[in-house]
């Protein structure tokens, strides 16, 4: 019976470590997808000149948070300031993206391309910091949770 309880505790702690690793991976995925969105939107502004809502509806994202954010922007549901429903991004990052999305279309194409480049540099710096964080802490969280689980089992026995 002690073995089953011990294994359950260790598996539970490992699960927490894997959840932390997954959260860090989702943050990296969000910023990668946002960068891909910016690259494709830059091409759209330069050549296709499709409307923003049409472009967003045709954009397929692997990040659920980016999809939620873009859908809320196009739908403008009952509450524009709704910050719930995002799993890994912070409210400051949501505000940064919203500020960019609301600034789209207020200038001509040349200035719009410059705005996209400025926003892209901000996102690139965030993406680089998130990649460093992921490479530093993802494996560590699983190992640390395993060690913590074993330590709890030892203390319980």
Predicted feature residues:
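Generic structural signal for well-ordered, non-membrane alpha-helices
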Residues: 32, 36-39, 95-99, 118-121, ...
